[in-house]
Swiss-Prot record:
Catalytic reaction(s) noted: N-terminal glycyl-[protein] + tetradecanoyl-CoA = N-tetradecanoylglycyl-[protein] + CoA + H(+)
Species for this entry: Arabidopsis thaliana
Gene: NMT2
EC number: 2.3.1.97
Keyword Cell division set for record: no
GO molecular function, one term: glycylpeptide N-tetradecanoyltransferase activity
Protein name as it appears in the record: Putative glycylpeptide N-tetradecanoyltransferase 2
Length: 430
């Protein structure tokens, strides 16, 4: 089970981060076909570990007799294995206390140096960001699981989860949201990942929680759905200068900059930063909006306070307030991640914004997201990411987003859906 708020944020801690490679597809019209063929090849591969887990299997796709719901029934907590799984002799389990500044610094360095994404790109997660992503209200410290070398005490692996509520059809299910799975790059052949997943699963069950949600850039089993990541350049000159994209054919730098230029200020009347007093209204907007999706996050006021109230350098949220009624009518948000750019004399970091959730009722969705692009540009972001879940597909091309090759596969652990979903049927904010 893996994914991140730290990716995106969002699989490195990942989880709250998506791929920051901005190399655009050469042929947008054929990309879907190519991706489809690649996925078919991946589907044919077997994953021995996941074939032993209570997850949806490809062999069951045509079996209409299988019911929706839990794959394995819950048991008594007293029947759950009480002792941790055994590690190889030179390793030991540890709890990662994110309230400790020293632990946060160690985690920062570990994730930065061992991100499973592009080796040339290093994600930067401040201690404030790590605590926001990993320690929401009601979190379990025992779910922040590390592996150390016994002799040196060096951290060499990390997995974590947090409790959440996810509505599947008409049922709200308590689940674990798996935020991150990261193993030291030199130890990935030691078989640690499956063991860490089993250990986290054991600890989740000890809290009487029997389902989980996670994402991965890899095909592990049959996904609930698969989304594609899209990118919108905010600072094209910088992105071209650092080599993350290039000028398109017959385009000059000045024409490219002009193509992606945004207004100096948001254009929607009543658009302002979200405040604490807006929490009940934003919660109501979110719950109403997410009710249309087959699988969605179940938000309450406490969730909104933690995940969506603005925090500098972490999450940015905005509302539209009607000038006539003074009601909150629309909402948009994005979180951020900084990336180290090695070997560039002019730039050392890239600032990335990731769309969280956009709810448009009186404002058009494209105008609302365009305002989000404007304020993210004002805040100094260089690039803006979004995936084609929920209703996002409706604005992507209009606002000059371009598709990336990277995809995110969404999974439910110990829960079966009879049919896979379209990305537009998914309302998970992970």
């Amino acid at each position: 089970m893996s994914d991140p708020k730290l990716k995106p944020v969002e699989d490195a801690l990942v989880t709250v981060a998506k791929s920051s490679q901005i190399q655009l597809a050469k042929d947008d019209t054929s990309g879907g076909t190519i991706v489809g063929r690649l996925l078919q090849c991946q589907y044919s591969k077997t994953h021995k570990f996941w074939e032993t887990q209570p997850v949806e299997q490809f062999k069951d796709i045509q079996d209409t007799s299988l019911p929706e719901g839990p794959i394995e029934p819950a048991t008594l907590v007293s029947e759950v294995k009480q002792e941790p799984y055994n590690l190889l002799g030179q390793f030991e389990w540890t709890i990662c206390d994110m309230n400790s500044d020293d632990m946060c610094l160690e985690m920062y360095n570990f994730l930065k140096e061992n991100s499973p994404d592009d080796q040339q790109i290093k994600y930067e997660y401040s201690k404030e960001y790590l605590r926001w992503a990993l320690c929401p209200p009601g979190y379990y410290q025992s779910w922040h699981i590390g592996v150390r070398v016994k002799t040196s005490k060096k951290l060499i692996a990390f997995i974590c989860g947090r409790p959440t509520r996810i509505r599947v059809r008409d049922e709200v299910v308590k689940m674990a949201k798996v935020n991150s799975l990261c193993v030291h790059k030199k130890l990935r052949s030691k078989g640690l990942a499956p063991l860490m997943i089993k250990e986290l699963t054991r600890r989740v069950k000890l809290q009487n929680i029997w389902q989980a949600a996670y994402t991965s850039s890899h095909i592990l089993s049959r996904p609930v759905t698969t989304s594609r990541d899209w990118v919108r350049m905010l600072n094209p000159k910088k992105l071209i200068d650092v080599g993350l994209t290039r000028l398109r054919d017959r385009m000059t730098m000045s024409r490219t900059v002009k193509l992606y230029k945004l207004p100096d200020a948001p254009i929607t009347p009543g658009f302002r930063e979200m405040e604490r007093r807006d929490v009940p209204a934003v919660t109501a907007l979110l719950r109403n909006y997410l009710s249309q999706f087959a699988v969605a996050t179940d938000f309450d006021d406490n969730d909104v306070k933690h995940w969506l109230l603005p925090r500098e350098n972490i999450v940015y949220s905005y509302v539209v307030v009607s000038p006539e009624t003074h009601d909150v009518t629309d909402f948009c948000s994005f979180c951020n991640s900084s990336i180290t750019i090695p070997g560039n004399r002019k730039y050392t970091t890239l600032e990335c914004a990731y769309a969280c959730c956009n709810v448009a009722t009186l404002t058009s969705l494209s105008q609302l997201v365009n305002d989000a692009l404007i304020v993210s540009k004002q805040k100094g972001f260089d690039v803006f990411y979004a995936s084609d879940v929920m209703q996002n597909e409706s604005f992507l091309k209009e606002l000059r987003f371009y598709p990336l090759c990277r995809q995110s596969h969404y999974y439910l652990y110990n829960y079966r859906l009879r049919n896979a979903l379209k990305p537009s049927e998914l309302g998970l904010i992970l």
